[in-house]
Amino acid sequence: MGEKMKSLDKMIKERLYAEVYEVLATDNFVYSYENLQKAFPKADSMQYYCFLMYSISKEETPEKHLAVCNLLAFGEPLLDDIYTLINWHINRTLSLFPAFTPIKSFAVYIFFHCPVSPISEGLLYEYALSVLQENPDDSLSKELIDEFESKK
């Protein structure tokens, strides 16, 4: 790991989010959960979450919301009711960026067949239809659509 990344890793652990944000902005950092893990391998989920929320407060993008959703779904547990937070980020993203299909695909992946899904089957069906328009080979969206339509 280069000295710059070691320094950033230390800064994020010290909660110097503004400084980290500025460095990443000048480097045209691409926000994703995977890229955060690579950039800050020693950070924990709470540090990622706090940094992402700071970053969203500076510039709200759908990619940052998707990174938060992936963190909440696949990172170490932060809270008891993560589905509520994930749903909030999905709704927020789609209210600002309605054509952002990756978050719809994420919702289908996480909440299809989830017994405690905060998203209705009807809305997941709409998301799946949208995903298929962009990615006709998405097998999970096809499965959701077939299952939903067979119940009609």
Model-identified regions with their sequence ranges:
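Alpha-solenoid repeat scaffolds
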Residues: 46, 62, 78-82, 100, ...
